[in-house]
């Protein structure tokens, strides 16, 4: 651990199209090998497809999707007395957001549609409607936390 105190959070610049820091964050997660232009193209094209699918404001659909998949509880492994316990704990708001964004990109890459834009648009629309793989992932995380409620007193 660092002895020089806490590290300051680096602030990201809002993206030029939607003026949103959240959009910049997901673009940075999509980005591979420093190709930010390509990541931006993928995300903006996906939002255009979301607009054609839902006939609604794409950034609002994206926010809805993110709110539907952000976990409130998670389990963390704690070693006590030679045993590992899955201890449920609340998720901080920043971590909630970053987990949601990472899950979107991870499951988009695993899906088997034709292009990344189509896959991303499909995942966003599904999550905004409250179904799909991402919502199941969140429910599974909550179920694990609920099942291990007995170990909640081991929290740190």
From Swiss-Prot:
<dbReference type="InterPro" id="IPR020606">
    <property type="entry name" value="Ribosomal_uS7_CS"/>
</dbReference>
<dbReference type="Pfam" id="PF00177">
    <property type="entry name" value="Ribosomal_S7"/>
</dbReference>
<keyword id="KW-0699">rRNA-binding</keyword>
<comment type="similarity">
    <text>Belongs to the universal ribosomal protein uS7 family.</text>
</comment>
<dbReference type="GO" id="GO:0003735">
    <property type="term" value="F:structural constituent of ribosome"/>
</dbReference>
<protein>
    <recommendedName>
        <fullName>Small ribosomal subunit protein uS7</fullName>
    </recommendedName>
</protein>
<dbReference type="InterPro" id="IPR005717">
    <property type="entry name" value="Ribosomal_uS7_bac/org-type"/>
</dbReference>
<dbReference type="GO" id="GO:0006412">
    <property type="term" value="P:translation"/>
</dbReference>
<dbReference type="GO" id="GO:0015935">
    <property type="term" value="C:small ribosomal subunit"/>
</dbReference>
<dbReference type="GO" id="GO:0019843">
    <property type="term" value="F:rRNA binding"/>
</dbReference>
<keyword id="KW-0694">RNA-binding</keyword>
<keyword id="KW-0820">tRNA-binding</keyword>
<comment type="subunit">
    <text>Part of the 30S ribosomal subunit. Contacts proteins S9 and S11.</text>
</comment>
<dbReference type="GO" id="GO:0000049">
    <property type="term" value="F:tRNA binding"/>
</dbReference>
<keyword id="KW-0687">Ribonucleoprotein</keyword>
<dbReference type="InterPro" id="IPR036823">
    <property type="entry name" value="Ribosomal_uS7_dom_sf"/>
</dbReference>
<comment type="function">
    <text>One of the primary rRNA binding proteins, it binds directly to 16S rRNA where it nucleates assembly of the head domain of the 30S subunit. Is located at the subunit interface close to the decoding center, probably blocks exit of the E-site tRNA.</text>
</comment>
<dbReference type="InterPro" id="IPR023798">
    <property type="entry name" value="Ribosomal_uS7_dom"/>
</dbReference>
<keyword id="KW-0689">Ribosomal protein</keyword>
<dbReference type="InterPro" id="IPR000235">
    <property type="entry name" value="Ribosomal_uS7"/>
</dbReference>
């Amino acid at each position: 651990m660092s002895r020089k105190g806490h590290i300051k959070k680096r602030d990201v610049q809002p993206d030029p199209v939607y003026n949103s820091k959240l959009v910049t964050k997901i673009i940075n997660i999509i980005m591979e090998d420093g190709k930010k232009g390509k990541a931006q193209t993928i995300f903006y094209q996906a939002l255009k497809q979301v607009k054609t699918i839902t006939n609604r404001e794409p950034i609002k659909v994206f926010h809805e999707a993110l709110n539907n998949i952000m976990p409130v509880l998670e389990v963390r492994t704690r070693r006590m007395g030679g045993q590992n316990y899955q201890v449920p704990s609340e998720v901080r708001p920043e971590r909630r957001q970053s987990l949601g964004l990472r899950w979107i990109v991870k499951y988009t890459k695993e899906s088997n549609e034709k292009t990344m834009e189509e896959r991303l648009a499909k995942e966003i629309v599904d999550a905004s409607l409250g179904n799909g793989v991402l919502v199941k992932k969140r429910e599974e995380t909550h179920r694990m936390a609920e099942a291990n409620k007995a170990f909640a007193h081991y929290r740190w």
